[in-house]
Structures are given as C-alpha cells and as structure tokens.
C-alpha cells in the first residue's frame, strides 16, 4: 500500500510537468484556430460585400421611385457602390469606417464611374479593410495588415438608343 501511494505522488508530479510543457502549445493552437476562423469569416463577409457592390455597379443606371433614372457612382450619390459595400459590411456586424472600395475597368475604354461603362464591359470591384478593425483577439499570431476581396462582373448598361418621334402612316 505504501508503494502505491509513493508511485501515485510521483505520477502526479509527472502529470504536472507534462501539463506545464504542453499547455503553451495548446494555448497557441486554440488562439491560432480562433484567429484563423475570424479571418475566414471576415474574408467571406468582404467577398459578399464586393459582390453586392459589383452587382450594383453592373446596373450603371437604376430607376428611382419617381420613375427617373439615377446614375450609379463609386463614391458619391445614393445609392453608390461604396455605400452598398459599407452597408453590407455593417449588416454583418463589422465596423466599416476604414473600408476602401476601388472600381477598375478590365476591358474596353477605361472609365471612372459605373454609369459610364458600355454594355458587356468587364470591371473589378476591390474591397479592403484593415485587419486591426475586425479582429477580436489582439494576439496577432497570423494576422495580416489588411484583408482584401475582389469581384468581377460585366456592365449591364443598356445600349443607347433614340426614339423615332414620327410614326409611320399607311
């Protein structure tokens, strides 16, 4: 009986040493997984926001509630590509104050605003947010300086046309 008590005390000491050696690695793994999961979540939110912004930019012009057309701009106007992206990010629960939205044409004549694009012209919306604004653990184990997402679409702006005001007669 005495020997079992001595062995169990030695075993308890070995368990404590093993835990002291393994705990830092387990802690780093858990924190790394949490940070990687958050990074993946934010990346998915940015991808969705870029897609929503590209979808709006693809329209170029929209018909507002009064029946007149409204031009789609990147940074100004209502709605704008930037406001659509920021609203999508805010609805997901992230801060959107330092979000950067860029619009770039990939084909055809370069234009600076979505409403100036021609039908079928391909463009790219890039959304960037500083990772420090969205991470929940300030451990900075794997964290990049910023996260970026891109969405490519083609312009759906209608071809310009004129209406013949004189009707044909028989």
Short names for language-model regions:
Residues 1-12:
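N-terminal leader/signal peptides at the extreme start of proteins
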Residues 2-3, 43, 48, 52-170:
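Short, conserved structural patches
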Residues 11-25:
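N-terminal signal-anchor/signal peptide hydrophobic helix marking the start
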Residues 17, 27-30, 42:
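Alpha-helical structural signal
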Residues 18, 35, 50:
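Conserved G/P- and acidic residue-centered "switch" motifs that form tight phosphate/ATP-binding loops
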Residues 22-35:
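Alpha-helical transmembrane segments of integral membrane proteins
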Residues 35-44:
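Transmembrane signal-anchor/signal-peptide helices with a preference for the extracytoplasmic
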């Amino acid at each position: 009986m005495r020997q079992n008590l001595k062995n169990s005390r030695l075993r308890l000491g070995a368990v404590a040493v093993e835990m002291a050696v393994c705990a830092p690695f387990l802690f780093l793994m858990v924190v790394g997984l949490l940070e990687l999961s958050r990074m993946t979540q934010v990346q998915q939110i940015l991808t969705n926001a870029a897609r929503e912004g590209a979808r709006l930019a693809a329209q170029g012009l929209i018909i507002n509630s009064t029946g007149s057309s409204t031009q789609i701009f990147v940074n100004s106007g209502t709605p704008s590509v930037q406001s659509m992206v920021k609203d999508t990010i805010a609805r997901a629960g992230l801060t959107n104050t330092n979000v950067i939205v860029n619009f770039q044409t990939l084909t055809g004549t370069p234009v600076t605003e979505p409403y100036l694009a021609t039908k079928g012209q391909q463009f790219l919306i890039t959304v960037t947010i500083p990772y420090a604004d969205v991470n929940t653990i300030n451990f900075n184990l794997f964290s990049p300086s910023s996260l970026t997402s891109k969405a490519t679409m083609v312009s759906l702006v209608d071809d310009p046309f004129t209406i013949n005001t004189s009707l044909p007669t028989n």
